């Protein structure tokens, strides 16, 4: 799709197949360095010529290294190319050392949803003190939008408008395809007749799987209504932490846990009729299993702001308990590794200083600002006969304090029983009398081939983390580290496993889909296809290919000296483009596509997800088809809503909303529709009002919050999931923001899954499989009821019914007099007019009880990379 925005600017929406081949006659940008080299080597003219480069032979220039045997290598430019549109970088080649005739020969498949006049190819020289622009080649958007192949030499011009040298140019080959002409987007991911899942990802789609979907940490029997499915089945509500506890208890060989936070004091089982393991903490359970001979490995994010040395304890900014958990397991057979979010070891100090928003980006910033955010539990479980298999749990739930909750989301009840020693509400200072912060999340269990892909992720990260640990111990004069702790499951005959292979350089070879680890047959009505996605780079894994052509073959991106897997964003883009009826999102954050914001377009939050959602709606408006997008987010990000970081995140969020409604309103006017933008896109949050229990202790001497007095508080939406057309579910640890989607910032893991026998394509009608049951179960929790009026989310009548309930709930939530809500769903407290203008509700510019602007405020004191 190509839409004219102004005389020169067009908005392109589709895929760009691009090949950056080579450049010619680049200038020597390192002349000063070359003069220094000659000065220092003048006295050693007879020295034996050597090749001092540590460069991959594939990274030589167009003429290779034919002169290297007779002459010392001349220091010259280290060129690379960035592909940019205004306020967004679309692609970046690797750096080629010392070459004025570089041959990159790199291919890119770029998802585009950007307005621009020219596509720019900036040729840069990588330097120890930062990159220098050699020059830029520009291709007009009109030429690209034609869809014709563009191939040839394009002049590289400097800032003066002239080439730095005569005939300086870059050779480019490209072709743009509008998204509505791409066949794979027409059927939906689940309805693809080729069943290839999301294309161009590191892990392929896996067949023969089983998935169990969870809402919240626990669901008590009878608290949610029965939901009928196809074939006479009834949706079964899972008990997440109880299932995880049972799986850990029954493990025979391995328990691997990855977390942003893992707290040894939490209890997984609290409200159950089965007494088993009810009184045992997570730490006690893991020690017990390790004493049975089970290999227990914990990989926890190392928060660099927390410390426990020389008797001085600093809990850290994020309060993850990492040092406390490490200390608890220190003298046990449980191996607990704290893993910092290091940048790539291939980046030098100055290479890590370059940042879109700040030149002061020292090496420690990566480890301080960004995190390991994945949440995974891997255990061996019972398979067919006497065999064992690998089972994975992934999603948004860390095994730590504040996460246990149920669909009731109590805020004042059971604080001394169910939530004893587990009170969590960071909105208020310690000691304040306040409601607990209820926690809503999504999680899942995976059995089958995809669970082994989660295992590959763990092993790649473990090898990298223990490599850093080994280096640290050597610096301290120690020589041993238990770096061979991973179970070699391929050597244990009764543990079913595909064949894992590695190249000599340690590169992981992703195994083919192996029927030996299938847990269901393809003709089984309850069969699942599952695919694993990640946001991660070579600074956090050991096993990525070292060469560009191998990375390209594994659908990884090369960015200067990094190899990047950003398949979570790829999955979101392709799934949104493939949606046919509706999209339902729950996410802790919602911001992106900053290149199209009304203000601060250079914030760097250039993930495509919000723009893709808006353009999906636009495409349906043009086709005169119904489509609806529902987005559930927290009322405010966790913490004090008056604080600078929270206010800035809220500001980015409101900028994102405004951009989306602008796009939709403009299209409605273009087709002369009298529809309202809210007929297509709506934002919601969750809240709770609960009367004080009769046995609540007196508040004598305590600072009492208004939230406590009014008996209300938001339900914190920590979920990271998307349901499309009731046939495809995408969930994991990734937020919808730049930190989670970039691949070079927070590390994330997610899964996309569907039942091939429960799709629109297979049924010829609205499917009612497990994904449908999951969405209806979530809506039953949020809306306080279920029924036929919620079966078709794309219908305008359904959308208006949801809005009626959510708007009434907002009125009840803010009423000074206690009034119980119907469910928990609340219309997000911003108003949108027919022109798409987003503004605060009259008399409610700040959050009730706690303050802070609902629309947020920009802060000049914070780096944008922290809050985007």
Curated annotation (Swiss-Prot):
Pfam families: C2 (PF00168), PLD_C (PF12357), PLDc (PF00614). GO terms for molecular function: calcium ion binding; phospholipase D activity. Optimum pH is between 6.0 and 7.0. Expressed in roots, leaves, stems, siliques and flowers. Strongly expressed in the vascular tissues of cotyledons and leaves under dehydration stress conditions. Expression is higher in old leaves than in young leaves. Expressed in leaves and guard cells. The isoform 2 may not be present in siliques. SUPFAM superfamilies: C2 domain (Calcium/lipid-binding domain, CaLB), Phospholipase D/nuclease. One of its GO terms (biological process) is regulation of stomatal closure. Residues 368-403, 713-740 form the PLD phosphodiesterase domain. It catalyses: a 1,2-diacyl-sn-glycero-3-phosphocholine + H2O = a 1,2-diacyl-sn-glycero-3-phosphate + choline + H(+). It is a peripheral membrane protein. A 1,2-diacyl-sn-glycero-3-phosphate binds at residues 373, 588, 718. InterPro entries: C2_dom, C2_domain_sf, PLipase_D/transphosphatidylase, PLipase_D_C, PLipase_D_fam, PLipase_D_pln. One of its GO terms (cellular component) is plant cell papilla. Its cofactor is Ca(2+). Keywords: Calcium, Cell membrane, Hydrolase, Lipid degradation, Lipid metabolism, Membrane, Metal-binding, Repeat, Stress response. Residues 1-154 form the C2 domain. Its EC number is 3.1.4.4. Activated by free oleic acid in a dose-dependent manner and less effectively by other unsaturated fatty acids such as linoleic and linolenic acids. Not activated by the saturated fatty acids stearic and palmitic acids. PIP2 and Ca(2+) stimulate activity by promoting lipid substrate binding to the active site. Activated by H(2)O(2) and by binding to GAPC. The keyword Metal-binding applies. Hydrolyzes glycerol-phospholipids at the terminal phosphodiesteric bond to generate phosphatidic acids (PA). May be involved in PA accumulation in the dehydration stress response and in the transduction of hormonal and environmental signals to the microtubules cytoskeleton. Prefers phosphatidylethanolamine to phosphatidylcholine as substrate. Involved in H(2)O(2) and abscisic acid (ABA)-induced stomatal closure. Involved in nitric oxide (NO) signaling during stomatal closure. Plays a positive role in ABA-promoted senescence. Involved in basal defense and nonhost resistance. This is Phospholipase D delta. The gene is PLDDELTA.
